[in-house]
From Swiss-Prot:
<dbReference type="GO" id="GO:0031470">
    <property type="term" value="C:carboxysome"/>
</dbReference>
<comment type="function">
    <text>Catalyzes the N-acylation of UDP-3-O-acylglucosamine using 3-hydroxyacyl-ACP as the acyl donor. Is involved in the biosynthesis of lipid A, a phosphorylated glycolipid that anchors the lipopolysaccharide to the outer membrane of the cell.</text>
</comment>
<keyword id="KW-0808">Transferase</keyword>
<dbReference type="GO" id="GO:0043886">
    <property type="term" value="F:structural constituent of carboxysome shell"/>
</dbReference>
<dbReference type="Pfam" id="PF04613">
    <property type="entry name" value="LpxD"/>
</dbReference>
<feature type="active site" description="Proton acceptor">
    <location>
        <position position="248"/>
    </location>
</feature>
<comment type="pathway">
    <text>Bacterial outer membrane biogenesis; LPS lipid A biosynthesis.</text>
</comment>
<dbReference type="InterPro" id="IPR020573">
    <property type="entry name" value="UDP_GlcNAc_AcTrfase_non-rep"/>
</dbReference>
<dbReference type="Pfam" id="PF00132">
    <property type="entry name" value="Hexapep"/>
</dbReference>
<keyword id="KW-0443">Lipid metabolism</keyword>
<protein>
    <recommendedName>
        <fullName>UDP-3-O-acylglucosamine N-acyltransferase</fullName>
        <ecNumber>2.3.1.191</ecNumber>
    </recommendedName>
</protein>
<dbReference type="GO" id="GO:0016020">
    <property type="term" value="C:membrane"/>
</dbReference>
<comment type="subunit">
    <text>Homotrimer.</text>
</comment>
<dbReference type="GO" id="GO:0009245">
    <property type="term" value="P:lipid A biosynthetic process"/>
</dbReference>
<keyword id="KW-0012">Acyltransferase</keyword>
<dbReference type="GO" id="GO:0016410">
    <property type="term" value="F:N-acyltransferase activity"/>
</dbReference>
<keyword id="KW-0441">Lipid A biosynthesis</keyword>
Length: 347
């Protein structure tokens, strides 16, 4: 694909194309990181990117750049074709769609798929080998159901969803439009509900359901549990990484992002636009306000106000955590000082 053709495609996108210098208008075969790119590949740089130094000797064919004069001057001096955009990372994502367009599977039903006669599969949907779809389930139009997916009874899947190999949707689960459930993810599994008795643990029946609103993506190996009653709800546009556990009765707002190994205990309430970094834990019934950011391994035991940035275990304001971390490294020296003071203090 010629760089000039790619520029025309970016003009219709959302990355804010400002201007471009086509140079020799390279024919691009793909994309790569700047320090690994070849003459027929595209790359990008953001302001302050650690790879900026690589631009002086990179073999890259074309670049997406921020409006940063030193980078523009260097690219011009080296004769590299480039485009200046408001958001280079977003432009790169749009460019990858152009350079590597997805090939949709043919819209048919594989002969090894097992579909209950009371299930409905919408037009334009592709159902791959060894898929199982239970009674009363409805799969919308233009969906892609990859091999080995199991859809239990009474599941409703809206239009344009994609279920990757071996994903499992338990009874009563509801998926909005354009949801993606990746391989080995489980939606609607039984919540961890048991009642202690004199004879041991008595299982609490989990009769609720899981609802994924429009545009939710669930990573590989993640699980979203259904509650005993009511629902577990994931807000529209929320993105869930691999190996995330979301407990029964949790609700999240719109546009959240949860990184790998996040664990959210039952009944927690997560606001809109919340970002939880890797291995963050949220306690049972904790309320996390809108736009909260929690750094990796933070343990959220109590409610967190909207807009807060928290770190540490238990989670505290990030700036306070930085001061505590700095003090922690000085504890051995402080302990020695205290011991010396005790030795030198008359009893």
């Amino acid at each position: 694909m010629r760089f000039s053709s790619l520029i025309k495609a970016l003009q219709a996108g959302e990355s804010g194309l400002r201007w471009s210098q086509l140079g020799q208008d390279p024919d691009l075969s793909g994309a790569a990181a700047l320090d690994q790119a070849l003459g027929d590949q595209l790359s990008f740089l953001e302001a302050g990117n650690v790879l900026s130094a690589s631009l002086s000797d990179s073999a890259v064919g074309a670049l997406l750049l921020p409006d940063q004069q030193d980078l523009i001057d260097l690219a011009s001096q080296r004769g590299i074709a480039f485009a200046v955009v408001s958001d280079p990372r977003l432009a790169f994502a749009e460019a990858l769609d152009c350079l590597h367009p997805r090939q949709r599977p043919q819209a048919d039903i594989h002969h090894t798929a097992v579909i209950d006669e009371r299930a409905v599969v919408g037009p334009g949907t592709a159902v791959a080998a060894r898929v199982c779809i239970g009674a009363g389930s409805r799969v919308g139009a233009d969906c892609i159901v990859h091999p080995g997916v199991v859809i239990y009874d009474d599941v409703v899947i809206a239009d344009g969803c994609e279920l990757h190999a071996n994903a499992v949707l338990h009874p009563g689960s509801r998926l909005g439009r354009r949801c993606v459930v990746n391989s080995n993810a489980v939606v609607g599994s039984e919540g961890f509900g048991f009642v202690p008795t004199a004879k041991g643990w008595r299982k609490m029946p989990q009769t609720g359901q899981v609802v994924l609103e429009d545009g939710v993506e669930v990573g590989c190996g993640s699980t979203i549990d259904r509650p005993s009653v009511g629902e577990t709800r994931i807000g529209a546009g929320t993105k869930i990484d691999n190996l995330v556990q979301i407990g029964h009765g949790v609700s999240t707002g719109r546009g959240c992002a949860f990184a790998a190994q996040v664990g959210i205990a039952g009944g927690a309430r997560i606001g809109h636009g919340v970002i939880l970094a890797g291995q963050v834990g949220v306690a049972n019934r904790a309320v996390v306000g809108d736009r909260v950011m929690a750094s990796s391994k933070a343990g959220i035991h109590n409610d967190v106000d909207a807009g807060a940035v928290v770190s540490g275990y238990p989670a505290i304001p990030h700036r306070l955590w930085l001061r505590c971390s700095a003090a922690f490294s000085k504890l051995p020296e402080l302990a020695r000082t205290v011991r010396e003071l005790k030795r030198n203090t008359p009893q």
